[in-house]
């Protein structure tokens, strides 16, 4: 970005804005998939799909952390991880439900789909939340600025994004690659700044409104600043404890330098990431030069050694100096073992609809952090600086940075692995409920082999917990999607009767007094069309021998202590039975049977014909 052009055109730029908030934001333009800031920095944002890290085995977790360590070692100097919590986007799921309703022919199933659609809309507008995970990179110029710095920044940031994609794929995370990167960046900023408006009006509908406003004001619609499209209409910094952005109230918490635990497990940041609705987390990592940090550590160790010599064992500073010396040696040993030195900062954003709700959420967040021995401080009278720092622009305000920086090595930074989510939300799935841990919708497509290894589900619970209800709910919602469902219920089959009849299903009861039964000896021809389509023509196998083998297994389960002689007799009996049943028909053999069955019918028909003929002659 040419500095002279930006400075000389400042007066003209001030008149370009209709929204003063758009002029206040530190964003100059979005181009080439890069954000150009007003302080002449270049930033790129990528979105990451999370994984359920806490359900992985210890071995898998260790592998993920080691892969994340590899990513941190080759990442840019400044990295900003942002977790955004907002209302769940259910538009794609709703559209799929509507398409299924158009193809449904059964009236009862259509009513079921309408009720399901109302439920999805109600949950999506009030209760359900979702989380989006972003990484923001900043370009760090080497040496003095040169004329081709912009081209170097674009190349550097795109390379950093591709590298992140390769390394995070080893962790199990996928990067979302948008078709239009500039539009994606605008949509991300719109979601961050206009939380309430973005839930009602998507960015695609907001753009024509801004263009219409500029046209009505008589301004050039070809020279609209990009910040006008994602800037909120209201921004209030007049309060010391919170800010008001787009009609929502936000406050900020910092984890100070002394607020972290000395030892943490892998993925400990999931405590904050999945804290609940209205909680955003920003994690900043700043890599420091090794040679300079080794020099500073050695200098500080010498100073602390000289101080502890003058302090007695009963002095209050003795323990703190001793801990500082041990920490210094730990950091120095880690750097010697080829680990990098980072400054880590954690900023927590709390969002609510009213000041009272904001106070309640802030107190609950403090309790949650305190229960895990993590301290926090408020950003009172520095809410504006915290607001700007929470933007995904890799720019933490200096005072907040000094107040919250914590020195960590590469392994400590990797333990903050942030891409952790308990969400299970598939567009083509069925709703099972709301996750009570993080208020996310649980919409599962168990047949999606790209996400799940198989379609097996185990339902466990105490008596009265709702196992049968859940099974019935899944069956009804799978029927809504056109999936054929069979339920084998030995003891509770009657509980499924009404649901089965109301959606046009078939209720089959198998008992000694029932009209339905199962013929275990029937041979049915298997449908191999799908296998032949995939593998081509297949060798025809004997259906009789396969059936006899399965019957042997069936009878061995009924009679476990069957002897070899009995097995041989059973095999002989089965062969004779099928030989008598499956032999080719002989007319001489079946003619007596036909005469036996149809002779009385023939006599009745002849007698009836005579009666009809006699009645006709009498009428004439």
Locate predicted features.
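Extended, folded cores of ATP/NTP-driven motor/assembly subunits in large transport
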Residues: 2-419
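P-loop NTPase motor domains
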Residues: 24, 34, 46-52, 58-74, ...
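Post-Walker A helix-loop "phosphate-sensing" segment adjacent to the P-loop in P-loop NTPases
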Residues: 166, 476-486, 503-505
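Conserved beta-strand scaffold positions in the cores of enzyme catalytic domains, especially
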Residues: 456, 487, 505-509
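Hydrophobic anchor at the beta1->P-loop junction of P-loop NTPases
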Residues: 459
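Walker A (P-loop) phosphate-binding loop of P-loop NTPases
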Residues: 464
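Conserved lysine of the Walker
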Residues: 467
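Hydrophobic positions on the alpha1 helix immediately C-terminal to the Walker A/P-loop
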Residues: 470
């Amino acid at each position: 970005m040419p500095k002279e052009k930006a400075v000389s055109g400042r007066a003209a730029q001030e008149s370009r804005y209709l929204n003063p908030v758009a002029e206040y934001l530190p964003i100059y333009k979005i181009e080439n998939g890069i954000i150009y800031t007003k302080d002449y920095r270049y930033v790129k944002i990528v979105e990451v799909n999370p994984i359920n890290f806490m359900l992985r085995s210890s071995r898998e977790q260790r592998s993920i952390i080691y892969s994340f360590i590899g990513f941190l070692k080759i990442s840019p100097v400044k990295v900003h991880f942002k977790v955004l919590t907002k209302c769940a986007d259910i538009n794609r799921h709703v559209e799929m439900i509507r398409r299924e309703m158009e193809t449904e022919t059964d009236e009862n199933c259509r009513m079921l789909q309408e009720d399901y659609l109302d439920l999805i809309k109600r949950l999506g507008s009030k209760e359900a939340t979702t989380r989006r995970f972003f990484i923001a990179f900043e370009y760090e110029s080497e040496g003095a600025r040169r004329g081709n710095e912009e081209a170097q920044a674009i190349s550097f940031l795109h390379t950093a994004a591709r590298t992140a994609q390769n390394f995070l794929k080893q962790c199990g995370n996928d990067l979302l690659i948008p078709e239009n990167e500039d539009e994606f960046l605008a949509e991300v900023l719109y979601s961050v700044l206009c939380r309430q408006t973005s839930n009602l009006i998507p960015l695609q509908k907001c753009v024509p409104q801004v263009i219409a406003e500029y046209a009505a004001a008589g301004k050039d619609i070809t020279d609209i600043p990009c910040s006008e499209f994602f800037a909120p209409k209201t921004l209030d910094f007049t309060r010391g404890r919170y800010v008001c952005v787009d009609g929502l109230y936000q406050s900020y918490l910092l984890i100070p330098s002394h607020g972290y635990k000395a030892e943490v497990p892998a993925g400990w940041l999931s405590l904050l990431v999945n804290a609940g609705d209205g909680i955003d987390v920003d994690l900043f990592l700043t890599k420091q030069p090794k040679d300079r940090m080794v020099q500073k550590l050695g200098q500080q160790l010498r100073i602390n050694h000289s101080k502890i010599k003058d302090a007695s064992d009963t002095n209050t500073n003795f323990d703190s100096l001793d801990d500082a010396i041990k920490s210094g040696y730990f950091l120095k040993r880690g750097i010697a073992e080829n680990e990098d030195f980072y400054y880590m900062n954690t900023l927590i954003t709390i969002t609510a609809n009213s000041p009272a709700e904001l106070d309640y959420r802030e107190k609950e967040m403090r309790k949650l952090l305190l229960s895990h021995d993590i301290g926090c401080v408020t950003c009172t009278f520095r809410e504006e600086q915290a607001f700007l720092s929470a933007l995904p622009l890799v720019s933490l305000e200096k005072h907040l940075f000094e107040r919250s920086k914590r020195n960590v090595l590469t392994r400590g930074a990797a333990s903050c692995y942030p891409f952790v989510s308990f969400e299970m939300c598939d567009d083509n799935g069925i709703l099972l409920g709301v996750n009570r841990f993080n208020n996310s919708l649980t919409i599962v497509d168990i047949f999606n082999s790209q996400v799940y290894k198989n379609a097996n589900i185990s339902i466990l619970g105490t008596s009265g917990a709702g196992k049968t209800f859940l099974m019935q709910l899944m069956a009804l919602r799978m029927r809504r999607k056109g999936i054929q469902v069979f339920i084998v219920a030995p003891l509770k089959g009657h509980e499924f009767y009404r649901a089965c009849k109301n959606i046009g299903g078939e209720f089959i009861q198998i008992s000694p007094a029932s009209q339905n039964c199962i013929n275990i000896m029937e041979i049915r021809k298997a449908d191999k069309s799908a296998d032949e389509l995939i593998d081509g023509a297949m060798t025809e196998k004997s259906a009789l021998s396969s059936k006899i083998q399965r019957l042997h297994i069936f009878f061995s389960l009924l009679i476990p202590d069957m002897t070899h002689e009995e097995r041989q007799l059973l095999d002989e009996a089965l062969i004779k039975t099928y030989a008598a049943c499956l032999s080719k028909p002989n007319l001489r053999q079946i003619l007596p049977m036909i005469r036996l069955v149809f002779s009385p019918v023939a006599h009745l028909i002849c007698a009836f014909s005579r009666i009809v003929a006699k009645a006709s002659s009498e009428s004439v």
